[in-house]
Swiss-Prot record:
Assembly mode: Part of the 30S ribosomal subunit. Contacts protein S5. The interaction surface between S4 and S5 is involved in control of translational fidelity.
Function: One of the primary rRNA binding proteins, it binds directly to 16S rRNA where it nucleates assembly of the body of the 30S subunit. With S5 and S12 plays an important role in translational accuracy.
Protein name, as recorded: Small ribosomal subunit protein uS4
TM annotation in the entry: none
UniProt keyword Disulfide bond, yes or no: no
Molecular function, one GO term: structural constituent of ribosome
PROSITE patterns in UniProt: RIBOSOMAL_S4, S4
GO biological process: ribosomal small subunit biogenesis; translation
Gene3D superfamilies in UniProt: Ribosomal Protein S4 Delta 41, Chain A, domain 1, RNA-binding S4 domain
Assigned protein family: Belongs to the universal ribosomal protein uS4 family.
Residues annotated as domain S4 RNA-binding: 99-170
Alphabetical UniProt keywords: Ribonucleoprotein, Ribosomal protein, RNA-binding, rRNA-binding
Length: 210
């Protein structure tokens, strides 16, 4: 299975934005971005000439891909689904990304990062409405109940993650029941709740050129 194996902290520095890809480390003084908030490489601190519109659009797409941990083929497919839906294509794209099961597992607090959430899903620790689902890209729907398998609930890492979720908060479209290791999808996510600085129109403009 294809995956991105590049250095995680370099991605944040490349985007000049903390993407919270390494869980608890991102909230500590060990965060590489906090210590070196400039682009990676020998000339990372140098001044660059003005970039083209295409480069800006491409960078925005790469940022969102890194944030959600999605590779190009799947990202493009998600965009095509967003474009086919009613409404604004860019907003639809972000909502589809938010509805991914690995993202919902992360948002609910079962994992400290989306990378860890993908591992939890793939290793068959997650149930949807009582049935095991091991597909990270699975789209959660309103009314779904996401829960941790009984055998997985003793995992100290998961317990720590649920305690730490208070630091970043749980979005209003999810309702967390920490005691029972469950999260209910109260509603579909909306654009206003995605607080990371994303200019989705740039992604739409980029794909419209192809």
């Amino acid at each position: 299975m294809a995956r991105n194996i590049g250095a995680v902290c370099r991605r944040c520095r490349r985007e000049n934005l903390k993407l919270f890809l390494k869980g608890d480390r991102c909230y500590s003084d060990k965060c590489s971005f906090e210590r070196r908030a400039f682009a990676p490489g020998q000339h990372g601190q140098a001044r660059f000439k003005k970039v083209s519109d295409y480069a800006v659009q491409l960078r925005e797409k790469q940022k969102v891909k890194s944030m959600y941990g999605v590779l190009e083929a799947q990202f493009r497919l998600t965009f095509e689904k967003a474009e086919a839906q009613k409404g604004v294509a860019g907003e639809n794209l972000l909502i589809l990304l938010e509805r991914r099961l690995d993202n919902a597992v992360f948002r609910a607090g079962f994992a400290s990062s989306r990378t860890q959430a993908r591992q939890i899903v793939r290793h068959k620790h997650i149930l949807i409405n009582g049935k095991r689902v091991d597909i990270p890209s699975y789209q959660v729907s309103e009314g779904d109940v996401i829960s941790l398998r009984e055998k997985s609930r003793a995992n100290a890492g998961v317990v720590d993650n649920l305690e730490a979720v208070v630091r970043r908060g749980v979005p209003t479209w999810l309702e967390l029941d920490k005691d029972n290791f469950k999260a209910s999808v109260k509603a579909l996510p909306n654009r206003e709740e995605i607080t990371m600085p994303i200019q989705e129109r740039l992604i739409v403009e980029l794909y419209s050129k192809n």
